[in-house]
Amino acid sequence: WQFKGLGGQWDKAQILRGWQVATQVCLQCHGLQYVRPRDLMGLGFTEAQVEALATQANLTLGEPIRTALNEEDMKATYGMVVPDLSVMALARPDGVNYIKALMLGYTEAPADFVGTNYNKYFPGYNIAMPNPLSDGQVTYADGSPETVAQYSADVAAFLAWAADPHHVTRQNVGAYVLIFVALMALLTYLTMKAIWRDVKKQ
């Protein structure tokens, strides 16, 4: 992932593709109540660009992103209230890889499987959510592959950003602070060593 590690940065193109998958597919059932389209401006998109994206997705620039599916319909369809995706990438260990794997985990169920939908990466293998993705489902303007594998990576990256948009800044600032502290410690050590060397000579 481009946003991992020292010097990591959000991949704007990937997050934009992930936005497409999230708004065209995920929002059919899931909401993103702690995310607003306007938040994309923090990545460097202009207000006009974000306004256009919001309009295409029938969203309002400064309003939380909510699903049109109400709780009664969720319970009737899935037997549960569908989870909000705003902080899903933080709610699971190694969340971004968990989300990607989950999207890729829909395979043919073994003969002895008992349940609704089989997913080899979901705990217990039985997941209420049907496979949401298929090749060619979302059209990308940048020429990226329109495959389940690409959709899965893109929506995972988008949800990682949605859950913690300040991750990259905090990660890089923290690393530079540690480097600064290490240099100061080294400088202090060398200074003290020089002082004591002079003291011993006296």
Which residues does each PLM region occupy?
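Extended, hydrophilic extramembrane loops/domains of integral membrane proteins
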Residues: M129-D164, V168
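Membrane-proximal low-complexity regions enriched in glycine and acidic/polar residues
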Residues: A48-N126
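Bilobed periplasmic-binding protein/Venus flytrap-like ligand-binding cleft at the lobe interface
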Residues: V21-A22, I99-T107, F158-A162
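Second-shell loop/turn segments in exported
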Residues: G5-G8, D84-A89, T139-P145
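Juxtamembrane interface at the cytosolic side of transmembrane helices
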Residues: R170-V173, V181-Q202
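Extracytoplasmic/secreted proteins, especially bacterial periplasmic and envelope-associated proteins
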Residues: A13, R17, V21, D84, ...
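Electrostatic cytochrome c docking/interface patches
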Residues: W1-Q20, G31-G42, V50, G143, ...
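The canonical Cys-X-X-Cys-His
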Residues: A22-Q33, V155
